[in-house]
């Protein structure tokens, strides 16, 4: 089960920023991590880094004081996903995700697998429509509605399955809060501070725009990880969010 101190720590990190780690070298990743403060952000570990470095890397980040969002987007038969989610909870992660397109039975099985963990269970969220996808991409999959409509369908399915929230585009946030309620967590990639390169995320917003739209957690990668002074960049984003909230 999770370290007893992890849940208390999860509750003390107030920052909505989740930094997406994207390194081919564990040494480079840790060199970056050691330049930032765990009170300023959480960290996201995706498929590439988890495959390269394994659960031990997640534990190393936790030992440095960071909450970890394990972004593996589980999508399989219900029993397999349930066991995978339970394994993530055993690892002590703060958040884990599945693909909503796996269906309600799969999501319910995943949620039920976390019941034994009680208050120590990670947040369980589902991926709706990837932020790199537009209407043409969906049409190629035989889906004839807009990304926003598809995201809403999958978000409602996720909410009805008892999960904590979804990964979505910031452009859908306001509508999803209306449909699924204010307690339903929205996690948004494709966030770029003003002046940043758009990269491969087509549907983007700035942190302040995302916050105003109702986003709970914003995933930011290269604008922070490639910054000459990532700690300062994080501070500037947090200040902009505080100013945006008070304006």
Swiss-Prot record:
Its EC number is 4.1.1.23. Coiled coil: none annotated. GO terms for cellular component: cytosol. It comes from the Bacteria. It catalyses: orotidine 5'-phosphate + H(+) = UMP + CO2. InterPro entries: Aldolase_TIM, OMPdecase, OMPdecase_AS, OMPdecase_bac, OMPdeCOase_dom, RibuloseP-bd_barrel. Belongs to the OMP decarboxylase family. Type 1 subfamily. This is Orotidine 5'-phosphate decarboxylase.
């Amino acid at each position: 089960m999770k370290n007893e101190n992890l849940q208390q720590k999860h509750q003390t990190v107030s920052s909505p920023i989740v930094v997406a780690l994207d390194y081919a070298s564990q040494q480079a990743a840790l060199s970056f991590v050691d330049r930032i403060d765990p009170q300023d952000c959480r960290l996201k570990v995706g498929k590439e880094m988890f495959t390269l470095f394994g659960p031990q890397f997640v534990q190393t980040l936790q030992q440095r004081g960071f909450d970890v969002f394990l972004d593996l987007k589980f999508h399989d038969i219900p029993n397999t996903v349930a066991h995978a989610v339970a394994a993530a909870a055993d690892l002590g992660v703060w958040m884990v995700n599945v693909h909503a397109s796996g269906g309600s039975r799969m999501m319910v099985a995943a949620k039920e697998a976390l019941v034994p963990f009680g208050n120590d269970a990670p947040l369980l969220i589902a991926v709706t429509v990837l932020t790199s996808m537009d209407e043409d991409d969906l049409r190629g999959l035989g889906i004839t509605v807009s990304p926003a409509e598809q995201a809403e369908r999958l978000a409602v399915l996720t909410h009805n399955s008892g999960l904590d929230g979804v990964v979505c585009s910031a452009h859908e946030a306001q509508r999803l809060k209306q449909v699924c309620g204010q307690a339903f967590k929205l996690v948004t990639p494709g966030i770029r501070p003003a002046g940043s390169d758009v990269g491969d995320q087509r549907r983007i917003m700035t942190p302040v725009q995302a916050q105003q739209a109702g986003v709970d957690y914003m995933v930011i990668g290269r604008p922070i990880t490639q910054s000459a002074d990532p700690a300062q960049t994080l501070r500037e984003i947090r200040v902009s969010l505080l100013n945006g909230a008070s304006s």
